[in-house]
């Protein structure tokens, strides 16, 4: 929707109408993942989930994108608030994409769009002006190298270039497409680093944050950008090792609880039949014992949630070949081990003129 405001600039000046855009987009952008061919740094820092193997690596970004949708405000029927899921389709099988679309639209009421080149992302941002909408938040989930977010990492020289969000694309981000309070978050490796320093920052060495992709993007879009100077780790996408062990143990407890619940229902049914029989006969003594007690769950609701997520991932793994999680990643992206000497976590980059 739009709000029309009138302002009087002076006694001799005509009244003017100023249109204030009040329609906002919250946008998740998901790259394609090719875990079989990782650069040496990513292979070291983004450890594969042992239980899921490389099949799990293939849906890291998708699962985090689904998780991110849940962090946004709920979309409204009049689209004044809209959640958007953009996905680069390179090397994702159609069956997987169709299921992701069903989850995004059906479970989260978000708009689902497929991209085949980086120009599609640039055009999407530019179209916010034509549609009189503004981006309130944008999140990138993809591989990354210094000075670029790689939405098609190691997909082939031509394709990789066409799916690269680099300095040139960052400078194309029209500030008018973003709300004044908008934020961009990059969960790609080293978006906040100014040049490739290898695996450690030497004493006295300048990481040149001011020359990073994050800073260039902040200046172009005139908003704050949050990015990692280090490589990023997706190893807890399916939960920490403790989470996964607990989920397996909870699954065992759930099976036991299911059997106990079935036994309880049989005992309860028998108890009710005996009560009814005694009431009908009037000569038969009613059961003198109290009704059976239902079994108590030996696990928390959170434990059950993690266990059921694991079960659903296994089902998807059998059906699609990958452990898609319609509830999203269990744990957020974190900092990797390198480059050593750089801050852990996300750094905030403000437009230069605001610093």
Where do the protein language model's features map onto the residues?
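Boundary/activation segment at the start of structured domains
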Residues: 1-80
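Detector for Asparagine
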Residues: 13, 49-52, 63, 157, ...
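Catalytic-core segments of thiol-dependent peptidases
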Residues: 33-38, 69-196, 313-322, 326-327, ...
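Short, flexible/disordered intra-domain loops and linkers
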Residues: 38-53, 150-159, 194-208
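Extracytoplasmic/periplasmic, Sec-exported soluble proteins
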Residues: 53, 57-60, 113, 165, ...
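A general structural detector for well-ordered alpha-helical segments in enzyme core domains, enriched
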Residues: 64-68, 169, 213, 217
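Active-site-proximal C-terminal subdomain of hydrolase catalytic domains
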Residues: 183-355
């Amino acid at each position: 929707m739009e709000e029309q405001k009138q302002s009087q600039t002076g006694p001799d000046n005509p009244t003017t109408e100023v249109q204030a855009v009040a329609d906002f987009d919250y946008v998740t952008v998901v790259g394609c993942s090719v875990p079989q061919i990782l650069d040496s740094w990513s292979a070291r820092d983004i450890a594969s989930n042992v239980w899921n193997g490389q099949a799990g690596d293939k849906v890291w970004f998708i699962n985090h994108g689904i998780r991110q949708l849940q962090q946004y405000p709920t979309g409204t029927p009049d689209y004044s608030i809209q959640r958007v899921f953009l996905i680069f389709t390179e090397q994702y099988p159609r069956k997987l994409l169709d299921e992701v679309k069903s989850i995004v639209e059906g479970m989260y009421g978000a708009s689902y769009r497929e991209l085949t080149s980086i120009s599609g992302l640039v055009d999407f941002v530019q179209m916010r002006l034509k549609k009189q909408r503004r981006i309130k938040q944008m999140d990138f989930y993809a591989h990354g190298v210094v000075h670029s977010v790689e939405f098609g990492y190691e997909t082939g020289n031509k394709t990789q270039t066409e799916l690269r969000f680099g300095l040139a694309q960052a400078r194309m981000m029209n500030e008018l497409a973003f709300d004044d309070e908008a934020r961009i978050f990059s969960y790609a490796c080293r978006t906040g680093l100014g040049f490739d320093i290898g695996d450690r920052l030497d004493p006295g060495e300048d990481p040149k944050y001011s020359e990073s992709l994050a800073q260039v993007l902040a200046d172009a879009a005139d908003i704050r950008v949050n990015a990692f100077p280090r490589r990023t780790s997706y190893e807890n996408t399916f939960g920490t090792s403790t989470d996964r062990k607990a989920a397996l143990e909870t699954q065992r407890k759930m099976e036991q609880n299911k059997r106990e619940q079935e036994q309880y229902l049989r005992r309860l049914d028998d108890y009710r039949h005996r009560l009814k029989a005694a009431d009908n006969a009037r000569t038969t003594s009613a059961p003198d014992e109290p009704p059976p007690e239902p079994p108590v769950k030996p696990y928390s609701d959170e434990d059950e949630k993690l266990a059921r997520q694991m079960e659903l991932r296994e089902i998807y793994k059998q059906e699609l070949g990958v452990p898609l999680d319609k509830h999203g990643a269990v744990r957020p992206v974190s900092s990797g081990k390198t480059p050593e000497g750089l801050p852990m976590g996300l750094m905030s980059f403000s437009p230069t003129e605001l610093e």
